[in-house]
């Protein structure tokens, strides 16, 4: 009798995706982040669901309801901090996952890569709207500053911003709709993740060498299930260390002050995972130019497959490209640091140089370096 795992319509899909899936035998720990992102998404949906049971999306009670969750709800504090720090873990895994794709040339699976970019935008939008919900000072002013950027769009800008606000400023209508979107978008992300996986399984996984591995595959279970469990345990360990020992390490103290439209905080800044993009936005003195640079800093990923000039897929055997890649990582860390600093000398200049370097590496230096490496190898 055939195994039900291989015949049942639903079990068959799970079997072909997570059990009998033919996988390259040499994929490293950098391939763990896909499953870790899935775990992060499930964790965020579950903790978010329990938070939504006690949260009220009204300007007069939102801040109090979050305080109530932390003080009065059974284990509300741990749910709240797992959700807040879970978002940080989510973005750490996201950036590692995208970095892996860039390093090993996984972007040559264009459908998977493009769905991934849409997923990235979806999760960024979700995180931004979630940051507004506690209705602290940084929530309110962050929402005001970021939504105001849309007013840079010629002709329709102002009307568009007021349409998103649901009034003439960030107020009750804005908070209610942000809560609605913050609740629905993770489910959209789940559907997109399924499509992401569907396209990946059409081609099979890439591997560190970049060489096709069709002739040499191993089943996903037990080899990679056990490896993913180890990754998941490490993820949960780091998350719980954060939650239980320093839950506010990555947050902003200003968000413990209730939102006050009459008092602007001295330094308005987003959560740490958006600081690199915020630094790029601030480094351009023109409003529209800044908004375009902000969008392009992520959208640039979409044209990476078109800029692939190397005859090798990954960077495993391309030392000059490797140096450029790590320079890009250092540049992004510099931008993250600059995004959290006040707008004054020397931070302005450093931010502008780091922003120029970011686009230079991706658009100019990497394609040229790949051509040079091809010539060195006489390919």
UniProtKB/Swiss-Prot annotation:
PANTHER family: CYTOCHROME B (PTHR19271:SF16). Component of the ubiquinol-cytochrome c reductase complex (complex III or cytochrome b-c1 complex) that is part of the mitochondrial respiratory chain. The b-c1 complex mediates electron transfer from ubiquinol to cytochrome c. Contributes to the generation of a proton gradient across the mitochondrial membrane that is then used for ATP synthesis. Heme 1 (or BL or b562) is low-potential and absorbs at about 562 nm, and heme 2 (or BH or b566) is high-potential and absorbs at about 566 nm. This is Cytochrome b. Heme b b566 binds at residues 97, 196. Belongs to the cytochrome b family. Keywords: Electron transport, Heme, Iron, Membrane, Metal-binding, Mitochondrion, Mitochondrion inner membrane, Respiratory chain, Transmembrane, Transmembrane helix, Transport, Ubiquinone. Its cofactor is heme b. The lineage of its organism: Eukaryota, Metazoa, Chordata, Craniata, Vertebrata. The gene is MT-CYB. The chain crosses the membrane at residues 33-53, 77-98, 113-133, 178-198, 226-246, 288-308, 320-340, 347-367. It is a multi-pass membrane protein. GO terms for molecular function: metal ion binding; ubiquinol-cytochrome-c reductase activity. The cytochrome bc1 complex contains 11 subunits: 3 respiratory subunits (MT-CYB, CYC1 and UQCRFS1), 2 core proteins (UQCRC1 and UQCRC2) and 6 low-molecular weight proteins (UQCRH/QCR6, UQCRB/QCR7, UQCRQ/QCR8, UQCR10/QCR9, UQCR11/QCR10 and a cleavage product of UQCRFS1). This cytochrome bc1 complex then forms a dimer. A ubiquinone binds at residue 201. It is found in: Mitochondrion inner membrane. SUPFAM superfamilies: a domain/subunit of cytochrome bc1 complex (Ubiquinol-cytochrome c reductase), Transmembrane di-heme cytochromes. GO terms for cellular component: mitochondrial inner membrane; respiratory chain complex III. It holds the Pfam family Cytochrome_B.
């Amino acid at each position: 009798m055939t195994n039900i795992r291989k015949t049942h319509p639903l079990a068959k899909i799970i079997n072909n995706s997570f059990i009998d899936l033919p996988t390259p035998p040499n994929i490293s720990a950098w391939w763990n982040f896909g499953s870790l992102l899935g775990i992060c998404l499930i964790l965020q949906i579950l903790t978010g669901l329990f938070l939504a049971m006690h949260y009220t999306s009204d300007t007069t009670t939102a801040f109090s309801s979050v305080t109530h969750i932390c003080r009065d709800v059974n284990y509300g504090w741990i749910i709240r901090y797992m959700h807040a720090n879970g978002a940080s873990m989510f973005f750490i895994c996201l950036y590692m996952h995208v970095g892996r794709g860039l390093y090993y040339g996984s972007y040559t699976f264009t459908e998977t890569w493009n769905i991934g970019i849409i997923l990235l935008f979806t999760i960024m939008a979700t995180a931004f709207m979630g940051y507004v919900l506690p209705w602290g000072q940084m929530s309110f002013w962050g929402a005001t500053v970021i939504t105001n950027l849309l007013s840079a769009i010629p002709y329709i800008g102002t009307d568009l911003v007021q349409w998103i606000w649901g009034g003439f400023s960030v107020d009750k209508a804005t908070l209610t709709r942000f809560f609605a979107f913050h609740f629905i978008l993770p489910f959209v992300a789940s559907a997109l993740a399924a499509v992401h996986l569907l396209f990946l399984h059409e081609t099979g996984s890439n591997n560190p060498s970049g060489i096709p591995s069709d002739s040499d595959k191993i089943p996903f279970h037990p080899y990679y299930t056990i490896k993913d469990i180890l990754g998941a345990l490490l993820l949960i360990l780091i998350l719980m260390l954060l939650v239980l020992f320093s839950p506010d390490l990555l947050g902003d103290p200003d968000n413990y002050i209730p939102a006050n439209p009459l008092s602007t905080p001295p330094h308005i800044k987003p959560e740490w995972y958006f600081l690199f993009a915020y630094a790029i936005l601030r480094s351009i003195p023109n409003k529209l130019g800044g908004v375009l640079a902000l969008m392009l800093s992520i959208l640039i990923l979409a044209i990476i497959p078109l800029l692939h000039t190397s005859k090798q897929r990954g960077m495993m055997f391309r030392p000059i490209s490797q140096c450029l890649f790590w320079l890009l990582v250092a540049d992004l860390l510099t931008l993250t640091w600059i995004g959290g600093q006040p707008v004054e000398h020397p931070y302005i200049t450093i931010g502008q140089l780091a922003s120029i370097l970011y686009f230079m590496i991706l658009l100019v230096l990497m394609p040229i370096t790949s051509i040079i490496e091809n010539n060195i190898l006489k390919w």
